[in-house]
């Protein structure tokens, strides 16, 4: 599990949902009949919440006011499993609160309550002391700047310098016109309008996009410059050349918090040793999930996997798979594995499993799961490609990706008629066997294994 330190402006997002069908007799304004209220984590806290949804360990650093909103905010963070030891209380300010009023699923007005004053000397010292204490423990840092007073120029540069000194990845979601504030960061994530404003350059052509990113790289020493382009995806530089990672088409309901989702998913992907292109693809998929929901929504790993793997109808998230299986009464067979470098032994095993029932469901370990189980050099083949290859086999009916170390949650949900494992589990505990009607062990075809294939490639390469 990656450990990420998120620093920035903490915002409470408050939503009033209802319907508006008449005007007030007091003034020509609509009257909202409130049907529902909700309070969400916003700003840097939404970044932290997104990371938690993606199974990261998060330490959050920022300030709230000494008020009811601040107390509720900290309580919500703790409920989400976010470490709040770096959340400081500022008695001189209110907790930043954005109230959105929504009628018939359309936002009609937003009311902001905030104080943007810089932090006082004591709070700055306490904040920096916390960061210095955590910097060696964490894997990466995110600065989420909403221009609410926490991340001024001096503090931002101090944090970036500290992160670089300890060789930590540091990403910044920028605000304002002066990007020297973020110089020497690993990556920044401005949108088109923000970058145009900062550089006084219209990003209306391939040439200008490339020029803008080169300025970020050469003038501000940003190692991985990129710009988010809404429906046009994400553009970045790779070896001096402009690369566009297209967005994933999906109906847009609400873009609130999409930028937070992008920087959270980019950070996690890069920390998992993904290339910048792979990280952008992952971020685009995560953004596609959240813009399809109302409010500061979250994307789960399962939802992102569905978006990334939607090229094959057999690849489903667990919720969708359960809905599909409810419609039939056939005998369900379940097995699971990494299936890294799919080979004849795998295919033979799956054919035998399918012969035991009507529907064969394969639980597939995610990339992160495999790294935890087998080390950082695995998997060889990405989960997207492994899922597609499995789904392409006629004996496999459905593939569901899981991010845990074991498939117990899948088995609990599916309650298969037959649970299948390899014969190497003879006299060993088969996880979830008590939840299936029957457990069967199948012999593997001799002479086939991923490890053997890898060793053969190594020998051939060395020869």
UniProtKB/Swiss-Prot annotation:
It catalyses: D-glycero-beta-D-manno-heptose 7-phosphate + ATP = D-glycero-beta-D-manno-heptose 1,7-bisphosphate + ADP + H(+); D-glycero-beta-D-manno-heptose 1-phosphate + ATP + H(+) = ADP-D-glycero-beta-D-manno-heptose + diphosphate. The keyword Methyltransferase does not apply. InterPro entries: Bifunc_HldE, Cyt_trans-like, PfkB_dom, RfaE_dom_I, RfaE_dom_II, Ribokinase-like, Rossmann-like_a/b/a_fold. Its EC number is 2.7.1.167, 2.7.7.70. ATP binds at residues 191-194. One of its GO terms (molecular function) is heptose 7-phosphate kinase activity. Residues 1-315 are annotated as: Ribokinase. PANTHER family: BIFUNCTIONAL PROTEIN HLDE. Homodimer. This is Bifunctional protein HldE. It comes from Helicobacter pylori (strain J99 / ATCC 700824) (Campylobacter pylori J99).
